């Protein structure tokens, strides 16, 4: 059996990161986390301990600070793989503050790759996004679909990161999985962890549930003239626990099968769901949610 060493998770207290930690621990991986809680809460790590029975070692630091980052690798020289989630991710904010997004998302990646080279880490899973496909001319997309012009600086940071990783693998002994996933949804069945961003949520499900719980007065549906069955925007949603398990599978692929270089994997359900269908789904109903149709001035993730 391959000794898989220790896995570093960046953004371990975040939505997808926390669910991935659960899945990795269930599959006998040892993990440590880096998260400065810029868009998450320490309580997520406390709940992970309740859920798994294991205390999560976390380092509260900024990944753009290379000297502080290197201290983690010096202390944990048995790190054998990295899953990189940590990034600024709000599309609309990235349009308003592009330099903030380019500086943070790219410099954090550069520093991690510097550490990969210095500390001989050869397995890297990157949290990419279906946003790299832009406004694709042909649907559904697959891993060979050409990348179109990015629709936001956030999406462009994902495109740039993929290119950097592809170039990096050409001259270094490293294996990379690029996971392009669609829209994560849901929460762990325990209810202890889920999507809990700071500030006003920009993903559709927290806005819907927040409206149901009375945290928001109304749920605004942006756009009602799309070429869809009910005129509202359609997205491919995938349960966050499935995405989390995909990262475990990607790591196993790197350790056991993959050769040096990049492998690209899309992660989605393959089925589109409109905003109105999502409102009507399961416990939600149009009778219990006050919603308003509006213009396409904003898009939920």
Predicted regions located by residue number:
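C-terminal substrate-binding subdomain of Rossmann-fold SDR/epimerase-dehydratase oxidoreductases
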Residues: 207-301
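A structural signal for well-ordered alpha-helical segments within the folded catalytic domains
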Residues: 107-110, 159, 163, 202, ...
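Short-chain dehydrogenase/reductase
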Residues: 102, 151-159, 194-202, 206, ...
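Residue-level signature of the cytosolic catalytic core of signaling kinases
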Residues: 61, 65, 197-201, 271
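Glycosyltransferase donor-binding loop in the core domain
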Residues: 64, 89, 101, 200, ...
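Short, flexible, glycine-rich and Lys/Arg-enriched loop motifs at helix boundaries
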Residues: 42-44, 183-203, 214-235
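Short capping/connector residues at structural and topological boundaries
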Residues: 96, 137-138, 144-146, 159, ...
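N-terminal Rossmann-like NAD(P)+-binding domain of SDR-like oxidoreductases, especially those catalyzing
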Residues: 1-187
């Amino acid at each position: 059996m391959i000794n898989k060493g220790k896995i570093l998770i960046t953004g371990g207290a975040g939505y997808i990161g926390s669910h991935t930690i659960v899945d990795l621990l269930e599959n006998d991986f040892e993990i440590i986390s880096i998260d400065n809680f810029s868009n998450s809460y320490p309580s997520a790590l406390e709940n992970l301990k309740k859920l798994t029975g294991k205390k999560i070692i976390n380092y509260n630091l900024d990944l753009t600070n290379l000297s502080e980052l290197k201290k983690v690798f010096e202390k944990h020289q048995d790190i054998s793989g990295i899953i990189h989630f940590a990034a600024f991710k709000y599309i609309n904010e990235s349009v308003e503050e592009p330099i903030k997004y380019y500086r943070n998302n790219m410099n954090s990646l550069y520093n991690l790759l510097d550490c990969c080279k210095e500390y001989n880490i050869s397995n890297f899973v990157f949290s990419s996004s279906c946003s790299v496909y832009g406004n694709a001319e042909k649907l559904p997309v697959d891993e060979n679909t050409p990348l179109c012009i990015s629709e936001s600086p956030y999406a462009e940071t994902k495109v740039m990161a993929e290119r950097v990783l592809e170039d990096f693998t050409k001259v270094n002994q490293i294996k990379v999985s690029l996971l392009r996933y669609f829209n994560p949804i849901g929460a762990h069945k325990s209810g202890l962890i889920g999507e809990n961003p700071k500030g006003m949520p920009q993903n559709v499900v927290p806005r819907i549930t927040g409206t149901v719980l009375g945290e928001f007065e109304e749920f605004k549906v942006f756009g009602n003239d799309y070429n869809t069955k009910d005129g509202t925007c359609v997205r491919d949603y995938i349960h966050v626990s499935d995405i989390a398990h995909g990262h475990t599978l990607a790591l196993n692929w790197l350790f056991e099968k993959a050769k040096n270089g990049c492998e690209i994997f899309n992660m989605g359900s393959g089925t589109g769901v409109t905003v109105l269908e999502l409102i009507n789904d399961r416990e939600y109903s149009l009778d219990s949610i006050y919603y308003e149709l509006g213009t396409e001035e904003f898009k939920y993730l």
